[in-house]
């Protein structure tokens, strides 16, 4: 059923690339979009009405007000179907219009008496860089008795790369970029064990990375040691020229439950990279990263190289 769509998309991309080379010095952003649309209409890739369509952005104030109202019903659970949560369009409206949305979100946050709705608005405001809901987010993280539901990396499409409710509040807290979040985030980190789901590690490391500070280095190093997070790498023997017998580790895959080897590596590397980015402590972060540059899992090796060479795993535009 998707074949016609893919064919049309492929033709459109090819046409755009050709126009860029012929008429825009290779810059696709500079091509004449109307001319491209006319060609695609001529070839029945697009309907004729497209030539009369106008840009919908920026949206009207009324649309933004309605979107903010709709977000009262935003849920925090994992859903893939709109019948469970149809607020995602409203969220897109708000996120794409931050300047207009923030005053409305702040008003809605202040006026609501429902804790779950207040948390909704606090999360959105934090992601938009506004600290109005900081107290609510900190309290939500502190009051969560544990981490709740979480998932390891696995071969399951629905849950392999997602976050649980507490994970999502922790990530939102990280967006505040304030020293006030260090203590609650470290407290949440210390609740984790080696067997804790990977999604919890990803959430707290992402949140702390957005608030990285030298004061976090020693607690992170202690966490690595006390939680037995170190030593899960599989260094390939051919890197050691003095070693006569060369081992050839088999890269471990994942199953429906995940697989401990790959997930344990993931956890160790995330915390070590965060430690390194916070200034390191007794070179512990660097030592782990250097070992992983020779790991059998190439994606971990590449990640370790990236952090060591750039001092961070986040681009200059991302954090």
Question: What is the meaning of each model-derived region?
Answer:
Residues 1-17:
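A conserved FAD-binding loop/helix module that cradles the flavin
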Residues 1-5, 27, 112, 160:
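Alpha-helix capping and helix-loop boundary segments enriched in small/acidic/polar residues
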Residues 18-52:
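Active-site-proximal substrate-binding core of FAD-dependent oxidoreductases
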Residues 40, 47-87:
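Charged, amphipathic alpha-helical linkers/stalks
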Residues 61-78, 98-111, 130-155, 178-192, ...:
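Amphipathic alpha-helical scaffolding segments comprising HEAT/armadillo-like alpha-solenoid repeats
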Residues 81-97, 107-110, 116-131, 139, ...:
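Structural detector for internal amphipathic alpha-helices that build alpha-solenoid repeat scaffolds
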Residues 113-114, 145, 162, 193-197, ...:
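Short inter-helical turns and helix N-cap capping residues of alpha-solenoid HEAT/ARM repeat scaffolds
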Residues 289-308:
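C-terminal/domain-terminus segments
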